[in-house]
Amino acid sequence: MVNATHITEEVRFESEEEIKDRYTEVNFESEKVKGAGVPVISTGRTAYVDDSEASTFVVGASGSGKTRKVLMPYTLSCIRKNENLVIHDPKGEINRYMYRELEKEGYEVIVLDYRRPLRGDRYNPLEYPSKLYKKGNTSRA
């Protein structure tokens, strides 16, 4: 159930000053940052990000800049904050642009390419339980 008691008749976009007060500033050129999250506004070198636990749903037509304007800055802020990442990247764009940066920062990059399985890494979800079973540890397998 939604609690709508905080909603007023006035609905508007936040001003730049309000955004700067509310969100965390991230400088992509520094090695470490205070926050990681989805960019609300960005100049390219810096951004104000929503580092709350809120979910984000990004919608846009093909070629509208979802990857370049939202996902790339989000990924970079997570790298700078040393966050763990699982990235769904069906076209391989983020992998293509961020792979070297991730490795440079010490990330282990695993690529599961379901379109071309021989090209990427492989993952067998039954491998670990199979090893446990073969060792006689059937209760954990």
Task: Describe each region flagged by the PLM.
Residues 27-141:
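Switch/coupling segment of Walker-type NTPase motor domains
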Residues 1-34:
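Charged, amphipathic alpha-helical linker segments immediately N-terminal to NTP-binding catalytic cores
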